Amino acid sequence: MASLIYRQLLANSYAVDLSDEIQSVGSEKNQRVTVNPGPFAQTGYAPVNWGPGEVNDSTVVQPVLDGPYQPASFDLPVGNWMLLAPTGPGVVVEGTDNSGRWLSVILIEPGVTSETRTYTMFGSSKQVLVSNASDTKWKFVEMMKTAVDGDYAEWGTLLSDTKLYGMMKYGERLFIYEGETPNATTKGYIVTNYASVEVRPYSDFYIISRSQESACTEYINNGLPPIQNTRNVVPVAISSRSIEPRRVQANEDIVVSKTSLWKEMQYNRDIIIRFRFDNSIIKSGGLAYKWAEISFKAANYQYNYMKDGEEVTAHTTCSVNGVNDFSFNGGSLPTDFAISRYEVIKENSYVYVDYWDDSQTFRNMVYVRSLAANLNDVMCSGGDYSFALPAGQWPVMKGGAATLHTAGVTLSTQFTDYVSLNSLRFRFRLAVEEPSFTITRTRVSKLYGLPAANPNGGREYYEVAGRFSLISLVPSNDDYQAPIMNSVTVRQDLERRLNELREEFNNLSQEIAVSQLIDLAMLPLDMFSMFSGIEGTVNAPQSMATNVMRKFKSSKLASSVSMLTDSLSDAASSIARSTSIRSIGSAASAWANISEQTQDAVNEVATISSQVSQISGKLRLKEITTPTEGMNFDDISAAVLKAKIDRSIQVDPNALPDVITEASEKFIRNRAYRVIDGDESFEAGTGGRFFANKVETLEEMPFNIEKFADLVTHSPVISAIIDFKTLKNLNDNYGITREQAFNLLRSNPKVLRGFIDPNNPIIKNRIEQLIMQCRL
């Protein structure tokens, strides 16, 4: 009935030969938009528009107009214009070096005939004869004396319709504006001790740097910009310029909010990212004159650097997306040089760099918001690659360059089925640069981009410096670590009783190798995987930290695992496929006697029927039950297991119900099955949920339950490991081919195992940390 199904499952493999067409999907495309994120740097999140978290910037932006400030006596900084904006007639400003110059500037309104007025200048009253013949412009008059008890004399005037006046100390002179607007110009007076000249303004004023003198002259002649003439601009005390600036730390932790159990921490960090490209160069068979492929592949790089006085170990994975395929064919003869395909990244490409280090920031980076980053640009230039021909001069691919500009940052996950590490994925867009790349002794020349032949150009790595900021939700007690959002195995382990976990991990931590932990995590998520998986761990000093494994080891089942696995496979082959899923009119309970529900199937094979009768009343198993619209789907695995258990006579029947019950309820409670028909995929989960999607576009489609039932009867059934939501996230973030989608849909074991690199120090260290957390 379901031989192909269970031969695949019991062999600890999910690969199913769907058709030759599926195997060749994607091979005819000339241009790929895909990404190979490497063996342990997969993204578990879709692209997200994160909030604008605070990022400190060291760039100094000097405004043209600094102010307005309230009138107050102060030491005017050398090389800065003081732009005064009086509102009425009278003394505008006073300045003196207390030795040879006493300057007082008075303002006279338009249309004043010659008259004597009294002004208070430097604390004493003086009578001054003033006049202003202009009917429209205001008149600034500079009154100067050279001795303390001397008389004031008029030194210069400024006729202004903007009512603005300027003064600056620079180059042993005191500069002011004279003439008539809109053609007023500067004039300097030699001052003996100009640096110590103290200025006392009597109106609001602004400070303008000498480098912006042209703007100051523009304001004197034509007036302030409109925004300075609104009621919303309020002058402040000049003492505010003397406030000691707080030096911001490059790396700082800020408590945003805090409760008894949790707190929000903002981490501002500087960062040094080092990465390198990797490539794959494959030669074609024959006379060694032809190359099949030159392509990019994910590259890992580990390094140490000092961050805020602490040495951190960082790990990066560099991958590319949106590659452009080129080719060169020098002729049809076997000795003609040719490259079937070589990849180049250009403006339409992206470079992804996944970054993780062992600092405190990444230990608690689980619940994150307000993620932002500022990074420098980096130029990547290619080197030379010589195509070693058996005879003749060698063609050389040389040149090519591209600049990487930061295009955003998201969370990514470096994970296995046992642990998941949240890391940062920095996304870079490309801009092509000089020089172009060429292949000498061929027609290929003046092409732009970075080819995959030698993308590092002889360098060990490329380096990018910058800063990032994020707000993370962490436990209030710094000794605790935030629970990690892991995949199925870890999540189910955490659901068990804490005391059992501590006891098991205390016993296992020094005796179980990391590779064995990974093997357990990689077990297929179906009931039969326990039988094939226990064979590799039954001789371990301790069980694998689960009650299920302990029960298997303590029972007689461990001694006959191999035979039982073969028996189950044979039994699955013996049952006719036509009854794999049946329409049950009455809502039959999954706890009902399985021998009654599968009697039709059992009767087809007499030997199986005789074995079923021996334990038909003892084994009651809760398996997949998916009720919908009056129809129940019972997983055929229950009948297969029941039919063949009795073939292993030495197995204690009393141990099996406990083992299978706990396995089905706890160890493998999250499960789904999938059937693929052409470009359509149907999926049924244990929770009574159904999905149907298009493989090509990953779009959801209506679920045809009749077609699903027919397909399950006549098609291979695959245990679904990667759900469609994850597939869609991968496609949105990278763009995956139809062939890659099929490999993930059918749970190809090579693809799944590609997620794990046991030699990766990040994963190894994280597993050890997880074990240490569970110790007493």
Curated annotation (Swiss-Prot):
Further remark: In group A rotaviruses, VP4 defines the P serotype. Some rotavirus strains are neuraminidase-sensitive and require sialic acid to attach to the cell surface. Some rotavirus strains are integrin-dependent. Some rotavirus strains depend on ganglioside for their entry into the host cell. Hsp70 also seems to be involved in the entry of some strains.
Give site residues, Cleavage: R231, N232, R241, S242, R247, V248
Span list, region Hydrophobic? 389-409
Which family does the entry's similarity section mention? Belongs to the rotavirus VP4 family.
Q: Which Pfam families match?
A: Rota_VP4_MID, VP4_haemagglut, VP4_helical
Question: What are the boundaries of the region Spike head?
Answer: 65-224
Q: Where is this motif: KID motif?
A: 644-646
Q: Sorted alphabetically, which Gene3D superfamilies does this protein's record hold?
A: 1.20.5.170, 2.60.120.200
Gene Ontology biological process:
permeabilization of host organelle membrane involved in viral entry into host cell; virion attachment to host cell
**Ranges spanned by the short sequence motif YGL motif, renumbered to the chain:** 448-450
Q: Cite the InterPro entries for this sequence.
A: ConA-like_dom_sf (IPR013320), Rota_A_VP4 (IPR042546), Rota_VP4_MID (IPR035330), Rota_VP4_MID_sf (IPR038017), VP4_concanavalin-like (IPR000416), VP4_helical (IPR035329)
Identify the stretch(es) annotated as Spike body and stalk (antigen domain): 248-479
A cellular component term from Gene Ontology for this protein is:
host cell rough endoplasmic reticulum
Cysteine pairings via disulfide bonds: C318-C380
User: Motif DGE motif: which ranges?
Assistant: 308-310
Domain of life (superkingdom): Viruses
By what name is this protein known? Answer: Outer capsid protein VP4
Task: Answer yes or no on keyword Membrane.
Answer: yes
